[in-house]
Regions:
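Short, acidic, Ser/Thr-enriched surface-loop or helix-capping motifs
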Residues: 52, 232-233, 332-333
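N-terminal targeting signals for export/organelle localization
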Residues: 79, 91-93, 101, 143, ...
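Short pre-active-site segment immediately N-terminal to redox-active cysteine/selenocysteine motifs
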Residues: 248-251, 255-259, 325
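Structural microenvironment flanking redox-active thiols in thiol-disulfide oxidoreductases
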Residues: 264-303, 310-320, 350
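A short beta-strand-turn-helix
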Residues: 228-251
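Thiol/disulfide oxidoreductase modules built on the thioredoxin-like
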Residues: 299-305, 312-357
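A non-transmembrane, solvent-exposed segment enriched in polar/low-complexity residues
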Residues: 17-159
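Sec-dependent bacterial lipoprotein signal peptides
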Residues: 1-15
């Protein structure tokens, strides 16, 4: 019996040791004007919160592996925050009017260096812009010189991002730049394939991977993907994309939001083609995404929208169609096949004229 007890005790000790997880203690300092404000710590699908007291706050927890997190603080009209790496140790986040800095742990120090280099590049570009303005150049000369300065800045930024990814593709920091470097699915896949598990498993990278997969599923020539918004109709009843698409008409679906300037700018074009083609062969449907219903309803009072609108669609449609920017205007054929994506302005008018006649 004693022997069994001794062995059991050793086994329990080993199990306990095996269950030990890295811990972090994140301390932060901020202007005392934020005293009493809620501080949010967001990472992946997890979150934590605390309150600023005497210009300070802290978070403590366990992690399986280093993870990127955002710290957000708001007090009235004042907002601040920064990105940190939650990793074993005691990182210290300092928030000032000039920006933020997190020190005290290896990956956070690496991130500081990258942020400093990025800021230096932007500073150089801003100085070039100011210098050009002061030279009194003619408009054409100014635009040409500014374009050259912009190209230099873009090339420098890409080089910095490429070097940072190469040096950090096996830790979570590599996930910061992989989406910046990828211009399309092919480039994303190439970067993803050489990245380590820490980068591949990062929430932002998984989201981008899913977006490209959904973008492929909803590319031109593919059948439409249906979705239902439970209170999406004007009356607050369920409405589906299939209520309109695949019913024998060409249907132009505009994914938009009330706060989106380019979305509003496209409305006159949509109103023009709707007036011209509305009927047995053509319909427009607006899908309000990333927007509050009340804001959409208010916007409709001043916009030339006379076509059906699906309200309060949130992120569901944009996820399904791989959309990361609006407006996104997609044309569906009479059978529900996707005819074209990214239609705007004159290109939109020309495509409809081709299909429906002038």
């Amino acid at each position: 019996m004693k022997k069994f007890t001794a062995i059991s005790a050793v086994s329990l000790l080993l199990v306990a040791c095996g269950e030990s997880r890295p811990t972090y203690l994140l301390s932060g300092t901020v202007d005392t004007l934020y005293d009493g404000a809620t501080v949010s710590l967001l990472y992946g699908e997890k979150s934590d919160s605390t309150v600023v007291s005497q210009g300070a706050f802290s978070f403590e927890g366990e992690i399986d592996a280093p993870v990127l997190a955002r710290v957000l603080i708001s007090q009235g009209d004042n907002r601040t925050g920064g990105m940190v790496v939650l990793e074993a140790g005691s990182p210290v986040l300092t928030l000032t009017e000039e920006g933020y800095r997190c020190s005290g742990t290896p990956l956070n120090e690496t991130l500081n260096g990258f942020n400093a280099s990025s800021q230096e590049l932007y500073k150089t570009y801003r100085e070039a812009y100011t210098s050009l303005r002061e030279q009194g150049l003619k408009d054409e000369e100014f635009r040409a010189a500014l374009e050259q300065a912009g190209e230099t800045f873009s090339a420098g930024s890409r080089k910095l991002n490429e070097e940072f990814f190469a040096a950090n593709r096996d830790n979570v920091l590599g996930s910061i730049v992989i989406t910046r470097l990828a211009d399309g699915k092919s480039q994303f896949d190439s970067l993803y394939n050489v990245a380590g598990e820490a980068v591949r498993n990062a929430a932002s990278v998984q989201q981008e991977k899913a977006r490209y997969e959904n973008l492929e599923k909803t590319s031109e020539g593919k059948m439409f993907t249906d979705f239902t918004i439970e209170k999406g109709s004007a009356e607050g009843t369920p409405v589906s994309l299939s209520d309109y698409v695949g019913k024998g008409k060409y249907v132009l679906v505009d994914f938009w939001a009330s706060w989106c300037g380019p979305c509003r700018g496209e409305m006159p074009n949509l109103a023009e083609v709707y007036k011209k083609y509305k009927g047995d062969r053509f319909e427009i449907v607006g899908v309000a995404v990333w927007d509050e219903r009340a804001d959409t309803e208010k916007a409709l009072e001043s916009l030339p929208i006379t076509w059906p609108v699906i309200f309060d669609a949130g992120q569901l449609p944009t996820d399904l169609y791989g959309i990361n920017g609006i407006p996104q205007i997609i044309l569906f054929g009479p059978d529900g096949t996707i005819v074209a994506r990214n239609l705007r302005g004159e290109e939109l008018k020309a495509r409809l004229a081709e299909l429906l006649g002038k």
